[in-house]
C-alpha cells in the first residue's frame, strides 16, 4: 500500500525517521540494488538480487530508526519486468511490517503516478 504525494515537502518527518529519496536517474536493477544497500546500510551478506532486497526490507534490525520512508520522485526507469518485480516487492515488504512495532515502512510516489502504478501492480510478473 503505497502513499502518494502532490508535493514531497508535504511528507513530514516524525520520530526521527530514516528518509531515503530514490534518485530519478536510476535506470537498472544493479543501480537500484546498490543504492538501497548503501542508503539503508544493508549487511555485507546482501545478495544483490530482488529476493535479497525483499529480505533486507523485511528485516531492517540494523537501523536504529523505527520509521523508514522511501520517497520516489517518479516511477523508476527500470525495464518493464524489473519495474513490476520492484513495485510488487515494495508492496509486499510494506505488508510484512503491518501490525509490527519494531519498524514501519512507508513508500511514497508522486500522485500523478498512481494510475500507472496500480496498473503495473495488477499485471502478472511473468
Where are the regions that the model predicts?
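Eukaryotic endosomal/vacuolar membrane-trafficking regulators centered on PX-domain-mediated PI3P pathways
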Residues: 1-46, 50-126
Amino acid at each position: 500500500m503505497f502513499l502518494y504525494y502532490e508535493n514531497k515537502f508535504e511528507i513530514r518527518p516524525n520520530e526521527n525517521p530514516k528518509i531515503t529519496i530514490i534518485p530519478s536517474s536510476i535506470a537498472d536493477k544493479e543501480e537500484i540494488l546498490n543504492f538501497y544497500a548503501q542508503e539503508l546500510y544493508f549487511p555485507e551478506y546482501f545478495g544483490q538480487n530482488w529476493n535479497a532486497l525483499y529480505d533486507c526490507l523485511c528485516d531492517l534490525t540494523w537501523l536504529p530508526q523505527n520509521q523508514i520512508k522511501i520517497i520516489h520522485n517518479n516511477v523508476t526507469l527500470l525495464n518493464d519486468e524489473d519495474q513490476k518485480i520492484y513495485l510488487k516487492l515494495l508492496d509486499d515488504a510494506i505488508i510484512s511490517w503491518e501490525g509490527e512495532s519494531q519498524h514501519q515502512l512507508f513508500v511514497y510516489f508522486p500522485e500523478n503516478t498512481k494510475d500507472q502504478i496500480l496498473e503495473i501492480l495488477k499485471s502478472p510478473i511473468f
